[in-house]
Structures are given as structure tokens and as C-alpha cells.
Amino acid sequence: MVHYPSDRTRRLSDTIAAIATPPGQGSVGIVRVSGPFCRQIAEQVTGRVPPPRYATFCHFRNRYGEILDQGLILYFPGPHSFTGEDVLELQGHGGPAIMDWLLSSVLQLGVRLARPGEFSERAFLNNKIDLAQAEAIADLIESASEQAARSALRSLHGEFSAQIQTLREQLTELRCVVEANIDFSDEDIDFIERGMVAERLKEIQSTLQSIHRSARQGALLREGVRVVLAGRPNVGKSSLHNRLAGFEAAIVTDVPGTTRDLLRENITIDGLPIHLSDTAGLHNSKDTIEQEGMRRTREELIHADHVLLVADDQSGLTEAEQAILDELPDDVTYTLIFNKIDLSGAPAGRWEELQGIALRLSALTGAGMDLLCQRLKECAGFDRESEGCFSARRRHLEALQRAGAAVVVARKILGDKGAEEILAEELRQAQNALAEITGEYRSDDLLGEIFSTFCIGK
């Protein structure tokens, strides 16, 4: 992997430091230092350079020799460290005052405060990890479920990157064959065994589709699904919200219009993160507060991934529900929920209406909730039993889609006479799209966008 000099790589001459543990009180706090002056920092703060990779007890002192704290110091000489540079960790007591005091003392020794994600960025620039692995670090820290953590670990261990690298090597081999044919076009030599190339392209396309499915599962685990509850007032939206959330997050009364503002909860269903929104009931009202609540409801519907349109089972689907359906954006999926079967006496069930999939349930008793949970996983395309998925982001999915589109074009034009140059270009486009995932083909703007979302000290 080759990275070219930029302002970012030139800043590697700086020594950086940051608190690496979460803010607040704790038994242990860590100040992490990386860069060429780690040995000098160790001597200044503790009076000696500790043996590499051994935890050594010491007193931490400021530049005037005053004791700040006591704890452990660890020294990792580069390149055998996380960042590939000399790294120092000062592990003291985890009070915020102690940590700030210790960090300030280190910064007074000519060290710069690290930017968010700069330690991981240096690991990437020093070829210790690729870009997908760097992103997996942040994903692992932010994991909201066991499944999300497992998928992030697989990416961190390089499983995602290894599959991408294998595909790039296969595309390189095909490009060599195609470009050799272009170079010797005047010598009546045909290097392309079109049957072989066609078969290889078919295999690459199939592998890309498989990787995309796994990556999409990982993206779902990371980003979750935005689900919005909508409907007329007093149809049980808030009761359904509370049932899904597992506690009484929303106030529930018999008075229509009780919910006047958005109420959001983050929940998980079998490991699938769901960002759930309860909204104000949509109806004709002259009340200023209700009108503002309904404006926010409509705005929330525009940004939804899936809408649960709740109706009263005793009333059925009315013109009011149909009007809400007509307002939904074309790319938003929805499920019709006929609630309150505890009053109508109908059994829980699922069927298909002219307008789409419908469920009959009771938010009060919980009857039919298993059908709703299954429906939400189905709409998201989530498979809890899917093994081998890895942490992925929207940019990864977009890159895989672009690579797949280029391979599709390559397969179509393979049999066209004189299309070798276009074929080679499509293969190159597929290669570059895949290289964006691991960072071998990237811009500094992309790096800035990615690493700025990391926590400081990582």
C-alpha cells in the first residue's frame, strides 16, 4: 500500500497527545502520546525511559518536579505500535482534574493536542491499518449491540479488506490481459480468451454481490433503520411506541392529541438498531401547537426509512389514513397497522392489502407484536442469522455498487469488436472504486471527513 505525501503526512513530525479515556470520573485515566519525542516526554514526566512494552510504576511530575499523580507508564517504540510511531501511555487515576492536569503538563513540553481520530489516522498513514479497518475502530466503539460489535471486529481484523483486495487482484489480472491485447493490436496477436474473461467477470460480479449483501447487513447494524409511527389521533401510536420501547416513554391517555411533539427512542430488535419516532396525530386542527406538531410529523415522514401507519381496527382504513399514504415519498416503505384488536375482538394476523402489507395487533396486550418485529426486520433486509457480515458504511456500499456497475458494463461489451480500450477502462473504474474502500485511492478531503468523526484520543 502506497500513500503519497500531503499536508497530513508532513504533520507526522509533530508529537501529539490526548486523553484516551472517556470524560468523567473513573478508576483509571489514560493520556496517550505519539510521535518522535516520546522518549524525551517519558524522561521529563517520570525521570526515565521505561523498558519497551512493560507496565512500569512511577510518579508523574510536571516540569517543575512537582508530583501530579502516580500510576503506570508504558512505552511502545515504533514501528511496533498502534500508530507505527513511538507511543507512550500514562495511566493514572481517572478523575477529570487529574487527567487535565497531566495532559496540560505534557502539552507544555512542546507536544500538540491531537485532533479527533488523529492516532488512528497516523496508523493509517503509516500503513499499520487500511481505511476500512480505521473506520471499524470507530464502529466498534459506537457499537450498540453484540452483533454490531462482532461485525466491527471482523472488519478490524481485516476480513472485509481481504475480500476487497482479492477482488482487486483479480481485476488487475484481467486488465493485464486486456491491455496486452491493446499494446499488441498491430501484431495480430489476441491475448484475450473471451470465454475465460467472461467466466472471470461473472465470478467477480457474483462475489461483488455477495460482499455487498454482507456489507449491507453490517451497515444496518451500524446505522440502524429510521421507523416513524404515524396516523390519526387516538389510534394507539404512543401505546405502540411504548410497547416497542419496552417502557412508558410516551404519555398515553384517552384524550385525542395528547402527543403534540416528536418523541424518539433508540431500540434494538434481535440486534437490529431502530431509531423509533412517535409523532403527533394528523388531522384538521386550528390549534397552533397541534399544527406545529403536525408540521414536524410530516417532516419526519420525509426522512423515514419505514413508516408504521397506525389505524383503529374498529374503524378500518379511513380516508384520513389514505390521505397520509398519499403524502408519503415514493421511496419510503410502510406497513399498515390495525391496532386495538383487544377491543375489536379480531385475531392477530398478517395479510396483504391493495395498499400493501397489513398487520392486526394490540399494543395494549402485545398480541401480534412478534409479527411486527418480523416485518421490521424484513423491511430492513436484516438477517440475524447471517454469519460473516462486517461493519460497513454508506460510502462502502456506494463504492461496491459503482464497482459492480463497471463490471456489468464490462461483461456487456466483452464481445464487441474493438472495445478493448473501453473494457480496460471499465475494469480500471471497478478497481478504483474498490480501492476507495481501503484507502489506496482516496483524497485528503475524504480522510478529513472520516477521521473528524472519531473521538479524541483514538
Curated annotation (Swiss-Prot):
<dbReference type="InterPro" id="IPR027417">
    <property type="entry name" value="P-loop_NTPase"/>
</dbReference>
<feature type="binding site">
    <location>
        <begin position="278"/>
        <end position="281"/>
    </location>
    <ligand>
        <name>GTP</name>
    </ligand>
</feature>
<dbReference type="InterPro" id="IPR006073">
    <property type="entry name" value="GTP-bd"/>
</dbReference>
<dbReference type="GO" id="GO:0003924">
    <property type="term" value="F:GTPase activity"/>
</dbReference>
<comment type="similarity">
    <text>Belongs to the TRAFAC class TrmE-Era-EngA-EngB-Septin-like GTPase superfamily. TrmE GTPase family.</text>
</comment>
<dbReference type="GO" id="GO:0005525">
    <property type="term" value="F:GTP binding"/>
</dbReference>
<feature type="binding site">
    <location>
        <position position="89"/>
    </location>
    <ligand>
        <name>(6S)-5-formyl-5,6,7,8-tetrahydrofolate</name>
    </ligand>
</feature>
<keyword id="KW-0630">Potassium</keyword>
<feature type="binding site">
    <location>
        <position position="255"/>
    </location>
    <ligand>
        <name>K(+)</name>
    </ligand>
</feature>
<dbReference type="Pfam" id="PF12631">
    <property type="entry name" value="MnmE_helical"/>
</dbReference>
<dbReference type="GO" id="GO:0046872">
    <property type="term" value="F:metal ion binding"/>
</dbReference>
<feature type="binding site">
    <location>
        <position position="259"/>
    </location>
    <ligand>
        <name>Mg(2+)</name>
    </ligand>
</feature>
<dbReference type="InterPro" id="IPR025867">
    <property type="entry name" value="MnmE_helical"/>
</dbReference>
<comment type="function">
    <text>Exhibits a very high intrinsic GTPase hydrolysis rate. Involved in the addition of a carboxymethylaminomethyl (cmnm) group at the wobble position (U34) of certain tRNAs, forming tRNA-cmnm(5)s(2)U34.</text>
</comment>
<dbReference type="Pfam" id="PF10396">
    <property type="entry name" value="TrmE_N"/>
</dbReference>
<protein>
    <recommendedName>
        <fullName>tRNA modification GTPase MnmE</fullName>
        <ecNumber>3.6.-.-</ecNumber>
    </recommendedName>
</protein>
<feature type="binding site">
    <location>
        <position position="234"/>
    </location>
    <ligand>
        <name>K(+)</name>
    </ligand>
</feature>
<dbReference type="InterPro" id="IPR005225">
    <property type="entry name" value="Small_GTP-bd"/>
</dbReference>
<dbReference type="InterPro" id="IPR031168">
    <property type="entry name" value="G_TrmE"/>
</dbReference>
<keyword id="KW-0342">GTP-binding</keyword>
<dbReference type="GO" id="GO:0005829">
    <property type="term" value="C:cytosol"/>
</dbReference>
<feature type="binding site">
    <location>
        <position position="32"/>
    </location>
    <ligand>
        <name>(6S)-5-formyl-5,6,7,8-tetrahydrofolate</name>
    </ligand>
</feature>
<feature type="binding site">
    <location>
        <position position="253"/>
    </location>
    <ligand>
        <name>K(+)</name>
    </ligand>
</feature>
<keyword id="KW-0819">tRNA processing</keyword>
<feature type="binding site">
    <location>
        <position position="258"/>
    </location>
    <ligand>
        <name>K(+)</name>
    </ligand>
</feature>
<feature type="binding site">
    <location>
        <position position="128"/>
    </location>
    <ligand>
        <name>(6S)-5-formyl-5,6,7,8-tetrahydrofolate</name>
    </ligand>
</feature>
<feature type="binding site">
    <location>
        <begin position="253"/>
        <end position="259"/>
    </location>
    <ligand>
        <name>GTP</name>
    </ligand>
</feature>
<dbReference type="InterPro" id="IPR027266">
    <property type="entry name" value="TrmE/GcvT_dom1"/>
</dbReference>
<keyword id="KW-0479">Metal-binding</keyword>
<keyword id="KW-0460">Magnesium</keyword>
<dbReference type="Pfam" id="PF01926">
    <property type="entry name" value="MMR_HSR1"/>
</dbReference>
<feature type="binding site">
    <location>
        <position position="238"/>
    </location>
    <ligand>
        <name>Mg(2+)</name>
    </ligand>
</feature>
<keyword id="KW-0547">Nucleotide-binding</keyword>
<dbReference type="GO" id="GO:0030488">
    <property type="term" value="P:tRNA methylation"/>
</dbReference>
<feature type="binding site">
    <location>
        <begin position="234"/>
        <end position="239"/>
    </location>
    <ligand>
        <name>GTP</name>
    </ligand>
</feature>
<comment type="subunit">
    <text>Homodimer. Heterotetramer of two MnmE and two MnmG subunits.</text>
</comment>
<keyword id="KW-0378">Hydrolase</keyword>
<feature type="binding site">
    <location>
        <position position="458"/>
    </location>
    <ligand>
        <name>(6S)-5-formyl-5,6,7,8-tetrahydrofolate</name>
    </ligand>
</feature>
<keyword id="KW-0963">Cytoplasm</keyword>
<dbReference type="GO" id="GO:0002098">
    <property type="term" value="P:tRNA wobble uridine modification"/>
</dbReference>
<dbReference type="InterPro" id="IPR004520">
    <property type="entry name" value="GTPase_MnmE"/>
</dbReference>
<dbReference type="InterPro" id="IPR027368">
    <property type="entry name" value="MnmE_dom2"/>
</dbReference>
